[in-house]
From Swiss-Prot:
SUPFAM superfamilies, per the entry: Nucleotidylyl transferase (SSF52374)
Keywords: ATP-binding, NAD, Nucleotide-binding, Nucleotidyltransferase, Pyridine nucleotide biosynthesis, Transferase
Family per record: Belongs to the NadD family.
EC number: 2.7.7.18
Protein name: Probable nicotinate-nucleotide adenylyltransferase
Record GO terms (molecular function): ATP binding; nicotinate-nucleotide adenylyltransferase activity
GO BP field: NAD biosynthetic process
HAMAP family (UniProt xref): NaMN_adenylyltr
Pathways per UniProt: Cofactor biosynthesis; NAD(+) biosynthesis; deamido-NAD(+) from nicotinate D-ribonucleotide: step 1/1
Function field: Catalyzes the reversible adenylation of nicotinate mononucleotide (NaMN) to nicotinic acid adenine dinucleotide (NaAD).
EC top class named in words: transferase
Keyword ATP-binding: yes
Length: 212
């Protein structure tokens, strides 16, 4: 089974997270996507909703969408959410499956700063979401890694055994949506219906999340 993994603060989860994940799922013919809320993001000091509330919002989204599942292993952890530790745990949970860790190009270009970043390739494939026509600049520190590990969708279709260590780039539709923008709109009394799944908006309104 091919399993995609998308982590994030999801404060709140919105179409800017969901639509690219759906496009990756379709492009790589993934069997399912694990949506994984962070508990203690290494690069962020605070969130605007509780871990329990963010878990519930993601759980409701997964119930509404086919092929999406909540993964709460980082949310249950009392230590920073280092990706290498998470992938080690997921590799034990899914020993016979092929893992695809999904990130944006903005994260990939800084991958060398991540904790034990080279070990990520020993545990999973990396999927880099990029806007159509975007390319990593020549001479960028991650250019060598991308060139050495880059795999095509055609190669994926011909592989029968689970593999890791490859990098797949997937063109995704631009999403001009951010959690910060959504929180600001809600704080001003605006309802960002086009940015949120109905179940998420309903939960936010019932819980009075992000309202001033």
């Amino acid at each position: 089974m091919r399993i995609g993994i998308l982590g994030g603060t999801f404060d709140p989860i919105h179409y800017g997270h969901i639509r690219p994940a759906m496009e990756v799922k379709a492009s790589l013919k993934l069997d399912k996507i694990l949506l994984m809320p962070n508990h203690i993001p290494p690069h962020k000091n605070t969130t605007h909703s509780s871990t329990a509330q963010r878990l519930e919002m993601v759980a409701q989204v997964c119930e509404a969408l086919t092929g999406f599942e909540l993964c709460d292993i980082e949310a249950k952890r009392d230590s920073p959410s280092y990706t290498v530790v998470t992938l080690q745990q997921l590799s034990r949970l899914y020993p016979d499956d092929e893992l695809f860790f999904i990130m944006g190009m903005d994260s990939f270009i800084h991958l060398q700063s991540w904790h034990k970043w080279l070990q990520l390739f020993e545990l999973a494939n990396i999927v880099v979401c990029q806007r159509p026509g975007w390319h990593l600049a020549e001479g960028h520190p991650m250019q060598h890694e991308l060139s050495a590990r880059h795999a095509t969708l055609e190669a994926l279709s011909h592989s029968s055994e689970p593999q890791h260590g490859r990098i797949f780039t997937v063109d995704i539709s631009p999403q001009d949506i951010s959690s910060t923008q959504i929180r600001s709109q809600l704080a001003m009394g605006e309802i960002p219906q086009d940015a949120l799944l109905p179940v998420t908006l309903n939960y936010i309104q019932k819980q009075r999340l992000y309202f001033s």
